């Protein structure tokens, strides 16, 4: 009956003690048992029907249960002073959460001050990072990076940002602030400083690497603009800016996030980052300082978007060591390890495991040699110089006694590893017993170059190790981005450093972490954003773009030259040679016509005849 009429009222005749038990349970009255005693209740069959029962004791069809108001009132506890006190503290804690989590309450909303932020590179792309922070009277630049050309930019080696807007405001600029020493953040510094100079503020390693670039470009005298800083100290730059560098973990040592303090409020720029809880040098990210600013109140956060799609926390650099140990332990011949030359902790671990297995270390590649030399010079890493050998000494040692650390992990045509793979390196030729370890990921666009180099290496008989666990990223995953957002707790959020889909994904993470959708803007290069305690808005667009550089002579290549080269590459060339008399300017012979990229060689004569 109950299953068939679940949720609907039924009539139950009250005839036996069994039914009495059910009725007493339904009315929540205590059941005393069936034994006869002085306290026994009268038989329910003799009860006077209540308003919900008919004369036969059946429940009326409306299904209302017998009233229990009397019992409910009897068991309801009246509020006491302590209850009211607890309720008051619940309200107070809710208000405390509101104050803690809503940055709106931490800012000076009466302030009329504002700051303008203008990215000139690094958005809609990976690389070329440069950003202008500007008040009414002064401005600073954060990073001055380069990027790499695509395959259509014939004869172009690097791209640098268009400095047109910097030329417009150069009299306002009071300094250049550097977050870290990767090429996409410092690579364009020599080209800027050949034209205009400002004080440069940064930690020692980035300044040292900028110094080597100045030396290569024959502008060594501009080292005088260096201002090394101490982390966790406020550095006054001009009158309108106070900047603090906070240690951050990344794929290059001595990286920083920065807090830019202005009259309008504090802007946190993360730089490139990941949250590595077990870094090789033990220097974890300064989360305490980020939290300090978050508690104090942050006007705007600008955060790295590169790994926005990665939902798994980024692996620790220290985790690569055991993987290298496993690979090195099985090697019977030479080991050739290639990685990014700037990843000094990766190189450090490779050298340590090479030493463990009794190998001498040969570092090949100009950028690799330079970076290791700088790191050792300033005691970022320490090795006995006796473990190193030159490239021309490699052949003097047994193969099992040699570790070669080299550039070329991206298959670059002029890199050391690529030249080894095609047999063109002067000192090192690939052998069938060699183990090649690629400890890097493919930068988007380089997959074809890497694949071609791998083909060359394997045709030479070498074994190639390209395992996933011998590389970890240097950029924050979604979970680390969430941690940054929660620690800093900004009122406004500007996702940066990545292609449009990366910053769009990061925007969603920001909304997930409590930043109102209206307080997030997706910038593009050249868009100027004005930020004040009460608002954030786009105000104008400035000229931006790319300048093409030929590394052979460090000269700029004009845009129309690149367009001509692209046209020549797609359409081909016709060359006509005509011999003309000096006396009367008449042709002395039939013209000779040669074509390139138009018809096949065997058809060239027929084409010329036509």
Feature-to-residue mapping (PLM):
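Intrinsically disordered, low-complexity RNA-associated tracts
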Residues: 1-97
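His/Asp/Glu-rich metal-coordinating catalytic cores
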Residues: 78-175, 182-397, 415-429, 448-451
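Hard-cation-handling environments
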Residues: 309-439, 443-490, 494-610
């Amino acid at each position: 009956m109950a299953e068939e009429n679940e949720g609907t009222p039924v009539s139950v005749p009250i005839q036996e003690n069994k039914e009495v038990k059910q009725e007493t349970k339904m009315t929540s009255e205590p059941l005393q048992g069936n034994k006869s005693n002085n306290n026994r209740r009268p038989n329910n069959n003799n009860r006077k029907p209540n308003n919900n029962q008919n004369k036969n004791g059946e429940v009326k069809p409306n299904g209302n249960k017998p009233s229990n108001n009397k019992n409910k009132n009897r068991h309801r506890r009246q509020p006491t002073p302590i209850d009211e006190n607890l309720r008051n503290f619940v309200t107070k804690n809710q208000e405390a959460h509101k104050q803690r989590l809503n940055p709106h309450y931490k800012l000076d909303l009466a302030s009329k001050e504002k700051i303008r932020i203008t990215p000139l590179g690094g958005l809609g792309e990976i690389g070329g990072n440069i950003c202008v922070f500007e008040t009414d009277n002064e401005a600073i630049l954060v990073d001055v990076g380069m990027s790499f050309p695509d395959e259509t930019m014939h004869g172009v080696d690097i791209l640098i940002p268009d400095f047109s807007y910097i030329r417009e405001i150069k009299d306002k600029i009071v300094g250049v602030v550097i977050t870290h020493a990767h090429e996409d953040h410092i690579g364009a510094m020599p080209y800027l400083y050949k034209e205009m100079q400002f004080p440069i503020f940064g930690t020692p390693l980035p300044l040292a690497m900028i110094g080597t670039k100045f030396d290569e470009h024959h502008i060594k005298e501009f080292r005088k603009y260096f201002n090394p800083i101490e982390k966790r100290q406020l550095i006054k730059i001009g009158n309108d800016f106070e900047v603090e560098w906070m240690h951050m973990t990344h794929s290059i040592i001595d990286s920083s996030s920065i807090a830019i303090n202005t009259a309008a409020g504090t802007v946190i720029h993360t730089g490139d980052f990941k949250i590595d809880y077990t870094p090789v040098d033990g220097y974890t990210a300064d989360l305490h300082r980020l939290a300090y600013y978050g508690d104090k109140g942050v006007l705007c956060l600008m955060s790295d978007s590169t790994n926005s799609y990665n939902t798994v926390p980024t692996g620790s650099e220290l985790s690569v060591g055991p993987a290298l140990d496993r690979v090195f332990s099985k090697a019977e011949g030479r080991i050739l390890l290639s990685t990014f030359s700037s990843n000094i902790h990766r190189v450090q671990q490779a050298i340590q495991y090479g030493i463990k297995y009794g190998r001498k270390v040969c570092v090949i590649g100009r950028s690799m040699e330079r970076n290791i030399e700088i790191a050792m010079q300033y005691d970022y890493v320490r090795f006995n110089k006796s473990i190193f050998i030159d490239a021309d000494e490699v052949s003097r040692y047994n193969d099992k006694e040699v570790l070669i650390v080299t550039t070329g992990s991206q298959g670059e045509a002029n890199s050391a590893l690529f030249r080894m793979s095609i047999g063109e390196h002067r000192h090192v030729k690939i052998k069938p017993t060699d183990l090649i370890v690629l400890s890097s990921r493919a930068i988007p666009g380089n997959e074809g170059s890497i694949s071609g180099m791998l083909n060359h290496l394997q045709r030479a008989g070498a074994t190639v190790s390209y395992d996933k666990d011998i590389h970890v990223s240097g950029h924050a995953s979604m979970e680390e981005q969430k941690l940054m957002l929660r620690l800093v707790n900004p009122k406004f959020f500007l996702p940066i450093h990545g292609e449009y889909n990366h910053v769009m994904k990061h925007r969603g993470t920001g909304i997930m972490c409590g930043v109102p959708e209206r307080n997030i803007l997706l910038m593009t290069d050249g868009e100027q954003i004005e930020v004040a305690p009460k608002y954030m808005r786009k105000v104008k667009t400035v000229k931006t773009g790319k300048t093409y550089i030929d590394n052979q002579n460090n000269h700029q290549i004009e845009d129309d030259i690149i367009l001509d080269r692209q046209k020549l590459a797609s359409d081909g060339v016709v060359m006509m040679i005509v011999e003309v008399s000096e006396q009367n300017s008449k042709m002395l012979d039939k013209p000779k016509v040669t074509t390139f990229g138009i018809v096949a060689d065997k058809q060239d004569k027929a084409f010329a005849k036509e």
